[in-house]
Swiss-Prot record:
GO molecular function, one term: oxidoreductase activity
Pfam families (UniProt xref): Amino_oxidase
Broad class of enzyme this protein falls into: oxidoreductase
Protein name: Hydroxysqualene dehydroxylase
Keywords: FAD, Flavoprotein, Oxidoreductase
Secretion signal span: none
Record field: catalytic activity: squalene + FAD + H2O + H(+) = hydroxysqualene + FADH2
Record family assignment: Belongs to the HpnE family.
Entry's EC annotation: 1.17.8.1
Record-linked InterPro entries: Amino_oxidase, FAD/NAD-bd_sf, SQase_HpnE, Zeta_carotene_desat/Oxidored
Keyword 4Fe-4S among record annotations: no
Length: 414
C-alpha cells in the first residue's frame, strides 16, 4: 500500500493524518520539534508550576471541520461551553457591561431586541454586515462597514480583530464574510463558544496522537525536513536531518509547515509573507465562581479574558503594536484590565507571557491573495496549514480543514 508522508505535526498535519488513517490509508508523520501541536500546544511552565497553553483558542459550535476531527479522535466532550450563544463584554472606556445574545435560528431576531444587541446600536446598523457578503477578494472591511457606530466600536471591531488577527479596517472583507456565513448566518446554535478544557493538548493533540498510535502510527519527532528532491513533476525523495526517504510508487507528500518554512523548501511558491503577533498572558490565580469563563474587553489592552481552574488567561490579537513594549509594563496594563473587568483589587500574582510573533499571516487583501491552493505544481505534493487558501482566516477551523482537504487530495490521486 502506498504511503502519505506528512511533514509537520501541528493541527493541519494531525488533521490530515487522522483523515487518511480514518479512510484506511497509511501515513508517516515527521516533526522537527520535540512535541506535536504547533501553535495549539500545551506545556508545563516552570515559573508558574502548572500546565498552560501557548495561546487561547476559541472554537464555535458551527466549526464543522473541527467537529468532524474531534468526533473521529473521540474528543468532542473535552470542552467547556455555555448552553447558548451569549457573549459578555466590558467596555473600559465607559465601564458599560453588556451581553450579546444571539437567536438560536438563522433569523436574527436578536438584532430587533434592544436588550440582546449592542448598547446604543440600532437595528439598521447591522445591515452593513450584508455588504460584506457581496465583497470580492480585493475589498477591505473598512471600505464597506462604517467605523463611527457603537456597533463597530463595541462589537465588530473586536470581533474582526479576533477572527482575522489583523486590524479590523484593514482586514479582507471576503474572509470576514466567510466567518459570518459559517457562524452568524446559521444562528446562535452555530455560534456557541467552545473552549478546550483543561488545555489545548488534552482536547486537540493528545487524543489525535492516541488515535493514530492505536492504528500503528507514531510521530517521528526531532526530525527536520531539510530538502525536497524533485524528479520531473513528482517528489522523488525527502532529505531529513537523520535520514533520506525515497518515495515509492503511489506515495504522496503533505507539507504542513509554516509558510516561511515552505518558501525555503518549494521553489517559486508564493505564500503570505507578512504576519501579526498574538500575545497571551497567564496569571496564577484561582478565579471566583462569579467570573465568566469568557469575557470580551473593549477599549483596553486585553481583548479576551478566559478563566480556568488554576489561572486567568488573557489574549491580545493583532499585537504587533505591543511587541516593543517592556514585558513588565505590558503585564501591568493587562492586570489593570482584569481588575477593572472583575471589580477587585489585589497584588499581581505570578505571571507568564507567551508571545507568538508570527502567529498568523496578516489577513489583508494583499496577503490573502498570496495564499496558495492545496495542490501544487507537483503531482504527489500537497499543502496544508491555516495559511493555505481555505477561504477562511488563519483559525483552528482553517488549519483542520486544510488538513482534511490535503488528505482528500492525497487519497484521490492514484
Amino acid at each position: 500500500m502506498s504511503v502519505t508522508h506528512i511533514i509537520g505535526a501541528g493541527l493541519a498535519g494531525l488533521s490530515a493524518a487522522v483523515a487518511i488513517t480514518h479512510a484506511g490509508g497509511r501515513v508517516k508523520i515527521y516533526e522537527a520539534s520535540a512535541m506535536a501541536g504547533g501553535r495549539a500546544r500545551s506545556y508545563h511552565d516552570k515559573k508558574l508550576g502548572i500546565e498552560i497553553d501557548n495561546g487561547n483558542h476559541m472554537l464555535l459550535s458551527g466549526n464543522h471541520s473541527a467537529k468532524t476531527y474531534l468526533k473521529r479522535i473521540g474528543a468532542e466532550h473535552r470542552f467547556k461551553s455555555p448552553k447558548e450563544a451569549a457573549f459578555s463584554f466590558c467596555d473600559l472606556s465607559d465601564k458599560e457591561r453588556f451581553t450579546i445574545k444571539l437567536s438560536n435560528g438563522p433569523l436574527p431576531w436578536w438584532v430587533l431586541c434592544a436588550k440582546s444587541r449592542v448598547p446604543h446600536s440600532k437595528a439598521k446598523d447591522y445591515l452593513a454586515l450584508l455588504s460584506l457578503l457581496l465583497a470580492d477578494h480585493n475589498t477591505k472591511i473598512g471600505d464597506l462597514v462604517p467605523d463611527n457606530t457603537a456597533l463597530w466600536r463595541k462589537l465588530l471591531d473586536p470581533f474582526f480583530v479576533s477572527v482575522l488577527n489583523t486590524p479590523a479596517r484593514e482586514g479582507a472583507a471576503c474572509l470576514a464574510a466567510a466567518v459570518i456565513r459559517e457562524t452568524l448566518m446559521k444562528g446562535g446554535k452555530a455560534c456557541i463558544p467552545r473552549i478546550a478544557y483543561p488545555n489545548l493538548a488534552s482536547s486537540f493533540i493528545d487524543p489525535a496522537l492516541d488515535y493514530l498510535k492505536a492504528r500503528g502510527v507514531e510521530v517521528d519527532f526531532r526530525n527536520r525536513l531539510r530538502q525536497i528532491h524533485f524528479s520531473g513533476q513528482d517528489v522523488a525523495s525527502l532529505e531529513f536531518a537523520h535520514q533520506d526517504v525515497k518515495l515509492g510508487k503511489g506515495d504522496k507528500v503533505i507539507i504542513a509547515l509554516p509558510a516561511w518554512v515552505v518558501q525555503s523548501l518549494i521553489p517559486d511558491i508564493e505564500t503570505p509573507d507578512k504576519y501579526q503577533a498574538i500575545i497571551n498572558a497567564h496569571f496564577l490565580m484561582k478565579p471566583t465562581a462569579a467570573m465568566p469563563h469568557i469575557m470580551g474587553v473593549v477599549g483596553g489592552t486585553a481583548d479576551w479574558i478566559f478563566t480556568f481552574e488554576n489561572r486567568i488567561s488573557v489574549t491580545i490579537s493583532a499585537a504587533n503594536h505591543l511587541l516593543a513594549l517592556e514585558k513588565e509594563e505590558l503585564v501591568k496594563r493587562i492586570w489593570d484590565d482584569i481588575q477593572t473587568v472583575y471589580a477587585f483589587k489585589q497584588d499581581m500574582p505570578e505571571w507568564q507571557v507567551v508571545t507568538e510573533k508570527r502567529a498568523t499571516f496578516e489577513a489583508t487583501v494583499e496577503q490573502n491573495n498570496r495564499r496558495p491552493p492545496a495542490v501544487t505544481a507537483w503531482n504527489n505534493l500537497f499543502l496544508a496549514g491555516n495559511w493555505v487558501r481555505t477561504g477562511l482566516p488563519a483559525t483552528i477551523e482553517s488549519a483542520i480543514r486544510s488538513g482534511q482537504t490535503a488528505a482528500d487530495l492525497a487519497l484521490s490521486h492514484s
